[in-house]
Swiss-Prot record:
NDH-1 shuttles electrons from NADH, via FMN and iron-sulfur (Fe-S) centers, to quinones in the respiratory chain. The immediate electron acceptor for the enzyme in this species is believed to be ubiquinone. Couples the redox reaction to proton translocation (for every two electrons transferred, four hydrogen ions are translocated across the cytoplasmic membrane), and thus conserves the redox energy in a proton gradient. The gene is nuoN. This is NADH-quinone oxidoreductase subunit N. It holds the Pfam family Proton_antipo_M. The lineage of its organism: Bacteria, Pseudomonadati, Pseudomonadota, Gammaproteobacteria, Enterobacterales. NDH-1 is composed of 13 different subunits. Subunits NuoA, H, J, K, L, M, N constitute the membrane sector of the complex.
Amino acid sequence: MIINLQQLTALLPLLIIMLTVITVILSISYNRNHFFVAVFSILGLIFALCSLYFLIEIIPINVSILFHFNSNAILYIGMILISSICTCIFSYPWLLKYPFNKEEFYLLVIISTLGAISLTISHHMASFFINIELISLPMFGLIAYSRYQKYSLESSLKYIILSGVSSSFLLFGIAWVYSISGGLDFLSIHKSFNFASEKEILVVLFGISMILLSLFFKLSIVPFHLWTPDIYQGSPTSVLSFFSTAGKISVFSVLLNFLSYFSNSDNKVIYFILSLIIILSILVGNLMALFQKDIKRFLGYTSISQIGYLLIVLLVSHKNYSFSLEASAIYLCGYLFSNIACLGIVNLISTSHINNNASSINSYRGLFWSHPLLSSVLTLVLISSAGIPMTLGFIGKFYILSIVMIEHLWLIGFAFLIGSLLGLYCYLRIILNLYLHPSKLFKRDLNIPLNWVYTPSGIVICISGIILLALGIYPNPLIGLIKCTI
């Protein structure tokens, strides 16, 4: 296969990341230098992000039968790269205290980023499966990186086993679909679904159901969510900022791309499965979050409901497909910056703790009285996650609710309302905890530096908070940008 100049330009972000991976490997082999590897990794990801500018004029474009670049893919790739950059920035102060090899952490993040970007542009089941694994395999190491902590290895082992089961379902589904379609690209599967006989359609539907089951596991939605709180609790906080954003954004992107070939509103089986999973995810995620005393487990359960809201865009008819792309992009922008800021603050507090662990919600009691700016940013982030007006989170939820109204999804709308009320109570419980007077029963062994706002992590946290507030008050620049790309 001959690749022309335009196709080579389209691959520029991937080529830059590959070059970064090779350089980091050589640096580790010859001379370990934590600072150099960290800076070079961040610069490589920034250059990859900037290279997306050169793709704007050449899209849409196919690179072989495996990859398809369009404006929507560029938007998701940008989100993934922002998440990866923030993860490397958050990880540096934590790794300074890490007693074992530090440089491999950045290598695993970059390799997983490579898989996430490749998955976003996948247009074929071969690249789809390979890139799912390319995301997951480094993630095993990242989750277990803090191996001296109590739950780290346990969480990694759980994720390895369950991820293996998920991959087996994915391969099983691909095999069933291929038996009828005779091809592995998404268009061939679409054609087999439309022109197959009644018996063959049942086989294709079963295969698609297995594929969706695997993706639902990666998105950690009900009923494939039971592993989520344990993984969140056992993983290093800086890893969670990557796991909960880049990993899920890439999987959602390929899910949206795959299902775009099928009219979910016309197919009753897929429509029913999606509707049931969405309702359960919204309600169960928020309901379980009510009873959590660990901040990481709390964020794990709320992530289930947040992805549940997002999946509503999959239920639109073809005539409203472009609006669903706009709604999902706006919602994901709010989701991305909320998670970056929230987990950045949790990481900052945890690394400042005497035991490098401040996961208990009680650790945050009265934080406002000692660190008012940090508490204010955390309050803003939680308010945005709850979907309160004047924040980007509200704009995202408003667009999702618009889809509910346009498509007349009244049962899902009722679940949306109940879930939002439960979520509001969950977030307000933590917000109020920040402004209570510090309890004498719970000693907070925190040593947060007074100049935290001038550190790289602090700058990222503050910028994320400003974005959530500014785009919540005046969202037109973001909406205009997304409309131009879609």
